[in-house]
């Protein structure tokens, strides 16, 4: 009879199992971190609805089965003494219990006796779900069932619904567990249709308030309670409910959770990121078109911006992290492409979302892809293979779309009828940042960087315009210098100038200088070297002793005059280039002066300050000097304009027929350099035992390289170092010393220090001049321009200097000056000399009665000693 009873039990259980769903695997999957068995919430919701119906049928079927079984049982006599004690109890003690996993909406049916212990219930669940009993927690009406108590202790009745969740390995946070249990219980009741006054938000606030601060490990364990208890899935399930009150409650709770995450300190926020990512994945499957999903995705993006502990948070699952965020990056890139195609943006916020996902995705690729980067496509089987192929397609789409955008920019720049610049700027504002992401992508694929270079070179005008308009101080512009050839002078100058701090116009913070013209160099040295970099960043207030004039015009004059003194060969600091007297390089012999290091540091500061204040001082650097400032190697071609004789000799050595060269014993050359300094001749070995090492056709390239280095670089190494130190003092903090010069070509620096190479255009000068007290048609104005055209270029520059304290015109011409020029009528004697107010670019002349008298007066002030002393302010 016992055997017969057992068979009946088994058949009943088997029948019931045929209707029940398999549950309890999701939390175990989370503990095992096995994402491959993930079941989407959308599918789970459908399963849940079906299971509710199945459960009803199952309950009726089970009840009928039990009635039939009990009828048969009543007709039998139970004779076996080995039957379990429950067989002697009344049949009414038999319970049918529904056990549900909230994360997946799955339900199983368990049969038990009222007086069975909770431990027995755990064993039955283990038998059905394969989840170890020790890893289970069963919740009923918000309370966890303790294993030693009976089911009747908790008043569990027929068809009761219990909730199965995974037991955490640690019980360090019982209050947090209770808080989460309360949340899950409330969600369960609301989902069943109960109209409750929700306390979920209050519980979420409580949960966040208890996050530990002791260590990353304790933070991770604590926050895992939230995800391992399936709260994200439960809230999303509630949000997908057809009841508006449920949807509203879930929406409020999710948004509260997100805002609390964002407000956390960085280390705690890092460990919240996997939970936010889980919310995003769930919402994307259930409601991708609703605002809550967009809010969640945006929150994830903002958290990714500061996420810098991937290995601590994801351990060995970092590759999985990359796979999980890739769909969001793809989605956002698609939106970005659409906005670009429509010429409607994107906005900074839209771009920032794409950028934050890309930065993390790039790190994953660099760390996890087994192949060397750049990658050659197609690849063999590797991590992230599908994502890398898809990413390459996105790169192509972005490159093509930005090509079209750049063409539109160039067309707009050429179209004078285009709307105001602010409207244009709003639609172009993120183009440069998007190009930066495209460049970052191009580093991953072989040949991609060349494709980007072709596109930028093709769109040089628009690319340069974007750099000038949108490259801002403090941004990372280093990537642009990989495409230096795709930029023009204005773009490169703009990028270099961004390395300087803003010139402040606050008179209270200006560094004041009162200098005697007769002692210009030494007094200027004391004022500049004795000041801190911060004081000089605050601006300069310049005044010459016994003169009334002050202001920007006087400052421009001082810059010009002090640079003329510094680079005067009589002062032995610098030497003129043999082939171009406008160019200078440090004098190797200057080291005999004990003050020479300080004077080169002073020179570096003065040149940097002149560039900061956009004053053309009229000196040019020798190419060799410029290359050393940029930290670049000097080649043979670089000395062509520095020492033509040595250049020709070295070139002849390198181009000579190898057999002829060797047959003539390398012209008798050895690895030495003959020098003469301060009348003393010396022989310097270019390498160890250089006197004994003969030059031949195989080592002549090495000989020339060493010769150039020893002849041009080594002798002025200390001077270059001191100049760089002074120059770097004037740059913004944390800017590498050589970065300014690396951003430029030598010709760019020429334009910044001396202005345009072309002769002054009188027509351009006239076009940028306005009149006060005169009309353009007055004969005095006509005479003025005729006289100016007759003057030599040096006389014209002297007039310009008297007028503006600028002796050189910017590369762009007169439009490059900070203001238009003005001719004012002087209401005094009609034969007096002109006056000027250099700060305001204002020239004052009387109404001269004859052209001859005007020419006399203008030629008088065109003399250097006059043009430097007649201006007022």
UniProtKB/Swiss-Prot annotation:
Keyword Electron transport in record: no
UniProt subcellular location: Cytoplasm
Transmembrane segments: none
Induction (UniProt): By jasmonate. Down-regulated by hydrogen peroxide.
Entry keywords, A to Z: Cytoplasm, Lectin, Transferase, Ubl conjugation pathway
E.C. code: 2.3.2.26
Top-rank taxon: Eukaryota
Bias kind Polar residues: ranges: 1-19
Residue ranges annotated for the C-type lectin domain, each copy included: 272-296
Active-site feature positions: 839
Its job: E3 ubiquitin protein ligase that regulates leaf senescence through ubiquitination and subsequent degradation of WRKY53.
Name of the protein in its database record: E3 ubiquitin-protein ligase UPL5
Annotated source species: Arabidopsis thaliana (Mouse-ear cress)
Origin organism lineage: Eukaryota, Viridiplantae, Streptophyta, Embryophyta, Tracheophyta
Gene (UniProt): UPL5
């Amino acid at each position: 009879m016992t055997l017969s009873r057992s068979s009946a039990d088994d058949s009943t259980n088997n029948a019931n199992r045929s209707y029940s769903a398999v549950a309890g695997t999701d939390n175990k999957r989370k503990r095992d971190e096995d994402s491959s068995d993930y079941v989407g919430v959308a599918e789970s919701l459908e399963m849940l609805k079906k299971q509710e119906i199945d459960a009803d049928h199952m309950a009726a079927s089970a009840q009928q089965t039990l009635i039939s079984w009990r009828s048969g049982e009543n007709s039998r006599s139970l004779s076996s003494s080995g039957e379990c004690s429950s067989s002697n109890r009344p049949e009414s003690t038999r319970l049918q219990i529904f056990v549900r996993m909230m994360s997946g909406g799955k339900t199983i049916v368990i049969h038990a006796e009222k007086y069975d212990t909770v431990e027995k219930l755990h064993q039955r669940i283990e038998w059905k779900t394969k989840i170890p009993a020790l890893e289970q927690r069963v919740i009923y009406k918000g309370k966890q069932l303790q294993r030693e108590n009976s089911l009747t202790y908790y008043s569990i009745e027929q068809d009761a619904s219990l909730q199965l969740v995974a037991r955490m390995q640690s019980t360090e946070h019982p209050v947090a567990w209770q808080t989460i249990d309360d949340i899950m219980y409330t969600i369960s009741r609301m989902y069943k249709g109960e109209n409750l006054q929700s306390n979920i938000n209050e519980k979420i606030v409580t949960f966040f308030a208890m996050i530990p601060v002791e260590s990353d490990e304790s933070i991770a364990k604590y926050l895992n309670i939230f995800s391992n208890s399936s709260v994200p899935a439960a809230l999303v399930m509630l949000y997908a409910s057809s009841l508006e009150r449920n949807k509203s409650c879930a929406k409020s709770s999710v948004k509260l959770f997100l805002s609390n995450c964002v407000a956390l300190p960085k280390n705690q926020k890092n460990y919240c990121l996997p939970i936010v990512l889980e919310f995003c994945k769930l919402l994307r499957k259930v409601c991708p078109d609703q605002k809550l999903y967009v809010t969640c995705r945006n929150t994830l993006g903002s958290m990714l911006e500061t996420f810098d502990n991937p290995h601590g948070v994801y351990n060995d699952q970092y590759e999985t992290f990359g796979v999980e965020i890739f769909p969001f990056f793809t989605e956002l890139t698609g939106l970005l492409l659409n906005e670009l195609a429509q010429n409607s943006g994107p906005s900074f916020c839209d771009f920032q979302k794409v950028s934050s996902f890309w930065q993390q995705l790039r790190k994953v690729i660099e760390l996890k892809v087994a192949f060397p980067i750049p990658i050659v496509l197609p690849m063999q089987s590797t991590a992230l293979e599908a994502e890398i192929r898809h990413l390459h397609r996105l790169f192509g789409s972005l490159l093509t779309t930005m090509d079209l955008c750049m063409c539109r920019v160039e067309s707009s720049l050429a179209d004078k009828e285009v709307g105001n610049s602010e409207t244009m700027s709003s639609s172009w504002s993120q183009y440069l940042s998007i190009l930066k992401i495209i460049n970052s992508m191009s580093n991953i694929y072989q040949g991609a960087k060349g494709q980007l270079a072709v596109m930028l070179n093709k769109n040089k005008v628009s690319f340069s315009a974007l750099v000038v308009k949108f490259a801002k101080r403090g941004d990372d512009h280093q990537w642009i210098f990989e495409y230096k050839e795709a930029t023009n002078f204005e773009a490169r100058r703009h990028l270099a100038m961004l390395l300087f701090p803003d010139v402040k116009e606050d008179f209270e913070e200006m560094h004041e200088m009162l200098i005697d013209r007769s002692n210009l160099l030494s007094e200027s040295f004391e004022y500049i070297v004795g000041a801190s970099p911060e004081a000089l960043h605050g601006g300069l207030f310049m005044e010459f002793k016994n003169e009334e004039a002050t202001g920007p015009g006087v400052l421009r004059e001082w810059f010009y005059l002090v640079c003329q003194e510094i680079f005067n060969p009589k002062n032995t600091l610098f030497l003129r280039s043999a082939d171009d007297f406008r160019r200078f390089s440090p004098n190797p012999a200057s080291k005999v002066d004990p003050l020479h290091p300080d004077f080169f540091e002073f020179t570096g500061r003065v040149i940097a300050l002149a560039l900061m204040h956009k004053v053309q001082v009229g000196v040019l650097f020798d190419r060799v000097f410029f290359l050393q400032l940029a930290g670049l190697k000097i080649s043979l071609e670089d000395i062509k304009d520095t020492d033509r004789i040595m250049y020709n000799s070295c070139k002849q050595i390198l181009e000579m027929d190898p057999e002829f060269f060797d047959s003539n014993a390398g012209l008798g050359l050895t690895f030495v350099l003959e020098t003469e300094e301060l009348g003393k001749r010396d022989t310097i070995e270019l390498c160890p035992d250089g006197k004994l090492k003969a030059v031949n056709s195989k080592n002549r390239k090495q000989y020339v390289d060493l010769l150039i280095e020893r002849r041009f670089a080594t002798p002025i190494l200390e001077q270059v170092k001191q100049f760089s130190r002074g120059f770097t003092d004037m740059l913004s903090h944390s800017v590498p010393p050589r970065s300014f010069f690396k951003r430029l070509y030598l010709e760019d620096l020429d334009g910044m220090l001396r202005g345009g190479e072309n002769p002054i255009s009188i027509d351009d000068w006239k076009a940028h001049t306005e009149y006060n007290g005169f009309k353009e048609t007055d004969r005095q104005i006509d005479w003025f321009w005729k006289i100016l055209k007759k003057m030599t270029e040096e006389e014209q520059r002297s007039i310009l200097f008297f007028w503006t304290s600028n002796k050189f015109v910017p590369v762009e011409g007169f439009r490059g000056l900070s203001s238009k020029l003005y001719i004012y009528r002087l209401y005094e004697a009609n034969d007096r000399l002109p006056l000027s107010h250099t700060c305001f670019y204002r020239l004052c002349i009387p109404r001269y009665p004859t052209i001859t008298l005007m020419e006399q007066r203008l030629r008088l002030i065109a003399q250097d000693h006059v043009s430097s002393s007649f201006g007022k302010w």
